[in-house]
């Protein structure tokens, strides 16, 4: 047995040396150390009201094994939040960059209504589906994350935004060439180009949602399956195709009914995000080792 102040000193000493601490307790004397720990754990059955109030987590069954499951669930939720944020920020950055490039060269690549559709329809369902992704195999093998680390993905968002933007501009150039026999972007006015750019960006973001199932690991090695993500991706793809192919919707959005050749090119450009991101992940894992 030790005094309450000794428990607090032990917790503070570990934290001062950069370790993540967890403290369990059930009595009033445990409250100070539970409050000072990174994760304060109170007992739901035998614990006092004081310890329950200061604790970050309360064990309803007083079973220490429950702590492991709770930590794993917390890590899974945190991972999924980061995945969804990275997915959405990368998509939004690509839209900003694409519009910026088109402004420099004096042409319209995507109209406001197109961007609104991508944000509300194309991105919405996959982002929600990423929130229910199962935990990765190495979830409990990782070291505790640094509390100072932000929830944003940093460099990954930047390169992914640039990648999607580049693919979108290339798609516009190809569509412009089909319509006007030129790849020039200066003052270009092409309904073919706008349609292919919209389709490429939309599908690239749909494919990218599968990349985001793991921020560092290969998606081809994941043992679990996210059926909700598959459903969300298929729904987004159907809606995106419908807005281009259904005449009254296409007229409302200013799209041209593209042929199978243009559709295949857009699909190929969009799908390229999967192997490209896989290569980047491979390099990141090699550097980390």
Question: Language-model segments: which ranges?
Answer:
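Residues immediately C-terminal
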Residues: 29-30, 66, 127, 282
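Structural signature of FAD isoalloxazine-binding scaffolds in flavoprotein oxidoreductases
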Residues: 33-35, 52-53
């Amino acid at each position: 047995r030790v005094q309450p102040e000794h428990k607090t000193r032990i917790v503070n000493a570990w934290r001062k040396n950069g370790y993540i601490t967890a403290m369990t307790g059930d009595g009033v004397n445990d409250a100070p150390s539970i409050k000072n720990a990174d994760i304060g754990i109170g007992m739901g059955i035998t614990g006092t009201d004081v310890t329950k109030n200061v604790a970050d987590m309360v064990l309803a069954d007083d079973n220490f094994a429950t702590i492991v499951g709770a930590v794993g669930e917390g890590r899974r939720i945190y991972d999924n939040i980061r995945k969804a944020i990275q997915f959405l920020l990368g998509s939004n950055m690509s839209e900003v960059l694409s519009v910026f490039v088109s402004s420099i060269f004096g042409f319209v690549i995507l109209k406001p209504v197109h961007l609104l559709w991508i944000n509300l329809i194309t991105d919405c369902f996959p982002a929600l589906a990423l929130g229910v992704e199962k935990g990765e195999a190495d979830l409990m093998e990782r070291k505790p994350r640094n509390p100072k680390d932000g929830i944003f993905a940093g460099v990954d968002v930047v390169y992914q935004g640039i990648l999607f933007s580049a693919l979108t501009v290339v798609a516009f150039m190809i569509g412009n060439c089909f319509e006007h026999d030129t790849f020039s972007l200066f003052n270009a006015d092409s309904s073919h180009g706008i349609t292919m750019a919209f389709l490429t960006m939309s599908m690239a973001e749909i494919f990218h949602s599968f990349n985001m199932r793991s921020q560092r690991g290969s998606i081809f090695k994941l043992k679990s399956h996210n059926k909700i993500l598959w459903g969300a991706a298929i729904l987004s793809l159907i809606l995106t195709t419908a807005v281009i192919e259904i005449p009254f919707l296409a007229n409302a959005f200013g799209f041209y009914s593209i042929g199978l050749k243009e559709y295949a090119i857009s699909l190929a450009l969009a799908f390229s995000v999967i192997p490209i991101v896989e290569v980047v992940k491979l390099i990141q894992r090699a550097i980390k080792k």
